[in-house]
Amino acid sequence: MYTVNDVLEYVQEEDVKFVRLAFFDLRGVQKNISIMAGQLESAFKNGVSFDASAIYGFETPEKSDLFLHPDPTTVAILPWRPNTGKVVRMFCTISHPDGTPYKKDCRTLLANAVKKAREDFGMEFRFGTEIEFYLFKLDEKGEPTKIPFDNASYMDIAPEDKGENIRREICFTLEQMGIQPEASHHEEGPGQNEIDFHYSDALTAADNAETFKWIVRTRAASAGLFADFSPKPISDQAGSGFHINISISDASKQRNMLAGILKHAEELTYYMNCTEESYDRLGSCKAPKYIAWGRENRSTFIRVPAITNDDASRIEIRTPDSECNPYIVFTLLIYAALDGIKNNLEPSEDVKENLFTEGSSSLSKGICTLPDTLDSAREIAQKSSFIKEALGF
């Protein structure tokens, strides 16, 4: 793990000329400011100021100065940039001018949730993501179309699968940036792909997910394609999910964790599915809308996968999509899980039916559904005392 001195030495020895200081708005959109390498020591010591009124969800113009503080443990070379005059990236924490943490810094929000789980509950959470995306062709002006790069389907191979070389480049780039992909394959939709990650701590997993989306877009653009992470880019094809796998250090608390997340599912939805298009995806093509859980059941909100010895506490949240802010979603999932653990909550019985085909009977069984529009999800979240306490704003 790099220290400040390690990074300063690395920058000098490796001919690094530019340092990108990255952070995120409340939607999870990555922002950055690029500084010259000679300014890095000052950035570590004093921070770098920016106009928070220009960032979505942050501050108003009358009091808008905030400071970025690079986290040396997140330094990574950008492999697609030149080898002479190299470029590195670090994620940042955000503070007010007096040094107090900024409450809407989503990386700090997640770090605080991790700290509470560790110090108050003796729990460590680990996250793994499965991120789906489409590759579309560009038109003669270089603008994205809705024409898929190929017409392959689930786990097809070349020549039907035209995305394997791009996935290969993406995986190589991830490894060069210190991220370990586990598997990649073609997904169900034409031009749709998926790459899965090795489990890691919550903050690293969120950093990796955001880095992944950046790499995919960059590598796709280099290949003359457009990478689309939206939840339902083609109305009659499979949507793209952001499946979240969670495990805890004490496997005996899995049921409590599961129950806590189910309890708060409606409140979480606005943050896991934060665009109008998100709600076109839910309810079909393995994107559940019923608040239930099942063993190996992909039609439920939470799936408990077939387990091996090293992931006995793992659960999978199947509804989120890639438009979400992973820092905020992971934060809320941790607090929901802790609520279940603290109050020793127990989940309802697991569902064995296919809820995509048995949905009408599910309502009569008392299985609730997620909000079906962005407006209804927003209203539920705005009224939630759980959300207010977890996020603090």
Predicted regions and their residues:
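Glycine-rich, acidic/polar active-site loops that bind/position phosphate-bearing ligands
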Residues: M1-F393
